């Protein structure tokens, strides 16, 4: 299969993902692995643009090289329901999962209502993030939100964070993993891509049935702005990450498309080495 100037060898998801493909319990996890295999990319772009034009421009540039877009719908200054619907339709046509990083934290009943509301997150998101601080009912509430509109989605629970001084301590992480791995509505967990040792421990605790997605990675390893730390993308995948979440490393690059392709190559290399 010829894609631009790059020769892409077709591979079945089962061959690329090994045990993760066999053990995955979430339909959305299978969908993600299919898209990632097709694009040979374990990259989710943190699409932190605050205008609709900026989001469309970014999606067009990086779409072939990323498997998902992480959005913050409430950051968009000129948001409208019509423009957002057009954006989401284009994203899905480009084989991009839409991951709304809402970080829900309330009780299940309220979270279900928040999936509706002015942004109607339930109608376009494939994945959302949540804290488990209010208990497992939050996952039931979020899944009920998707059920209300006849859609399927997955919840990513925050088990670790990559920012300095965060309060997600090991005991909390352990409880999140214990409760999350037992819940069918949980797609997976957010881990810390900047610390491979912590990520390896998280993968051991999680097992193969759930995804681990990780921010905190950059081809330029080190400290970033506002307390962020960065680890190497390939190392993160080798340590157990199933998707690297990349923001400024792509959208602030002179050529976002080329940057996305570089991250895709680094992530795919890690997956093949991990399962090789």
Predicted regions and their residues:
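Glycine-rich phosphate-binding active-site loops on the catalytic face of alpha/beta enzymes
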Residues: 126-134, 233-259
């Amino acid at each position: 299969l010829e894609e631009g100037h790059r020769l892409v060898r077709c591979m079945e998801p089962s061959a690329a993902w090994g045990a993760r493909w066999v053990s995955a319990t979430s339909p959305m996890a299978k969908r993600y692995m299919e898209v990632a295999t097709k694009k040979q990319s374990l990259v989710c772009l943190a699409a932190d643009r605050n205008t609709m034009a900026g989001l469309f421009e970014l999606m067009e540039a990086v779409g072939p090289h990323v498997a998902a877009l992480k959005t913050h719908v409430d950051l968009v200054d000129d948001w409208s329901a019509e423009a957002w619907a057009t954006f989401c339709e284009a994203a899905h046509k480009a084989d991009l999962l839409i991951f709304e990083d809402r970080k829900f934290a309330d009780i299940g009943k309220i979270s279900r209502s928040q999936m509706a509301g002015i942004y109607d997150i339930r109608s376009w998101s494939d994945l959302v993030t949540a804290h488990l601080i209010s208990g497992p009912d939050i996952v039931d509430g979020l899944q009920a939100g998707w059920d209300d509109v006849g859609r399927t989605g997955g919840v990513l629970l925050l088990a670790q964070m990559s920012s300095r001084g965060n309060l997600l301590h090991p005991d909390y992480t352990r409880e999140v993993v214990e409760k999350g791995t037992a819940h069918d509505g949980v797609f997976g967990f957010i881990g810390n891509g900047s610390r491979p040792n912590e990520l390896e421990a998280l993968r051991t605790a999680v097992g193969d049935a759930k995804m681990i997605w990780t921010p905190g990675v950059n081809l330029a390893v080190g400290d970033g702005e506002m307390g962020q730390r960065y680890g190497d993308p390939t190392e993160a995948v080798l340590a157990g990450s199933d998707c690297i979440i990349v923001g400024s490393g792509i959208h602030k690059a002179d050529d976002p498309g080329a940057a996305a392709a570089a991250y895709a190559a680094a992530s795919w290399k890690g997956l093949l080495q991990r399962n090789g």
